[in-house]
């Protein structure tokens, strides 16, 4: 009779445990999963998606490959994810608000409900300036924009990006005009302000955090209703101190795949979200370090949470004359004032 060595027994037990852990899922991927990040490396979407990818790998026992495909405000990579086979092996990442407003901008035909959403964090934007900037607070910045319409340069990741939508909300509420300078991602937009190419950036706290902590950017306000406590820096006041009537919805980020992938894919990923992502220390630590909110939602819950920012941004773009299609035409209701 053949006997197993103690090492072999240990290996077999380890295999049984790991394979059993994976076997609990209806979908067991047989090849690497690709997540397309439709922005440049180093931005907020890229950062958080890499954290989430590691957790998915651990849960499913399969590699997750991140591919950066920036272009056209994230719509290029998102379209590539949609055009790939709907088999669960190709996903896109980003802000749900971008995903929902692409039809209004004439960039993509697919609407928010055509995608299965798996959210991970909610990010807030920050008004950041170069340390040498003459603007010491939001009031001074807005006064400059009023005095010099269309002259103060603001760097964002592109049309309909989180930074752009945040600045549009401010501009409409304050009645100012600015010079919009776009980049292929939040990180390049932040670097542009650090380097003095632009005067202001309104990209996300997650993208500005390191530069703020290093003293290479000076935050004027968080574009939100509450102060932001940024680890290693301190308190950033809310823009509502100067603009109390500004309307702000929550900006959710995550990954998504077409709704018509095999049902076992969505069932399995829903389980992964409830069991793994919702308890992820790595993701919680990321959120705390980057000034983000931990929001591990999926299914109908994710759709209901995401639609608020989609409505806000779609109508902001339309009212600013930057939409190709009326939100009404693609079923996006105007938010209640």
Give residue ranges: language-model regions.
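Bacterial N-terminal signal peptides that target proteins for export
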Residues: 1-8
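An extracytoplasmic/periplasmic, membrane-proximal ligand-sensing/linker region
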Residues: 30, 266-337
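Hinge/capping helix and adjacent helix->loop/strand transition within the periplasmic-binding protein
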Residues: 30, 56, 80-90, 102-188, ...
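C-terminal lobe and pocket-closing loops
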Residues: 208-280, 327-337
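Short coil/turn segments
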Residues: 42, 96, 130-135, 156-161, ...
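Ligand-binding pocket segment of bilobal, Venus flytrap-like solute-binding proteins
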Residues: 151, 155-236
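Sec/Tat signal peptide C-region and signal peptidase I cleavage site
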Residues: 18-23
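N-terminal (or domain-start) structured segment
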Residues: 24-111, 151, 175-199, 204, ...
């Amino acid at each position: 009779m053949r006997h197993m060595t103690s090492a072999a027994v240990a290996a077999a037990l380890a295999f049984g445990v790991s394979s059993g852990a994976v076997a609990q899922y209806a979908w067991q991927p047989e090849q690497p999963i690709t997540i397309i990040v439709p922005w440049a490396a180093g931005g907020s979407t890229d950062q958080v998606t890499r954290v989430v990818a590691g957790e998915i790998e651990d849960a499913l026992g399969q590699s997750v490959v991140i591919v950066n495909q920036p272009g056209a405000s994230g719509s290029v990579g998102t379209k590539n994810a949609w055009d790939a086979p709907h088999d669960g092996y190709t996903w896109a990442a980003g802000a749900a608000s971008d995903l929902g407003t692409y039809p209004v901008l004439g960039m993509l035909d697919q609407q928010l409900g055509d995608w299965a959403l798996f959210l991970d964090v909610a990010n807030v934007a920050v008004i950041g300036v170069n340390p040498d900037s003459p603007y010491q607070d939001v009031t001074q910045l807005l006064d400059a924009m009023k005095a010099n319409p269309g002259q103060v340069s603001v760097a964002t990741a592109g049309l309909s990006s989180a930074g752009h939508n945040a600045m549009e909300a401010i501009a409409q509420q304050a009645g100012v005009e600015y010079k919009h300078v776009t980049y292929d991602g939040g990180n390049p937009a932040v670097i542009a302000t650090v380097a003095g190419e632009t005067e202001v950036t309104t990209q996300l706290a997650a993208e500005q955090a390191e530069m703020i902590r290093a003293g290479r950017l000076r935050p004027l306000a968080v574009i939100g209703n509450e102060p932001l406590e940024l680890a290693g820096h301190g308190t950033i006041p809310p823009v509502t101190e100067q603009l109390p009537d500004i309307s702000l919805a929550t900006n959710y980020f995550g990954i998504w795949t077409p709704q018509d992938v095999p049902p076992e894919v969505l069932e399995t990923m829903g389980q992964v979200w409830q069991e793994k992502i919702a308890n992820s220390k790595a993701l919680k630590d990321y959120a705390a370090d980057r000034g983000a909110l931990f929001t591990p939602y999926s299914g109908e819950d994710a759709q209901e949470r995401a639609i608020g920012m989609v409505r806000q941004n779609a109508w902001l773009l339309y009212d600013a004359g930057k939409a190709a299609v009326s939100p009404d035409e693609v079923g996006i209701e105007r938010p209640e004032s």
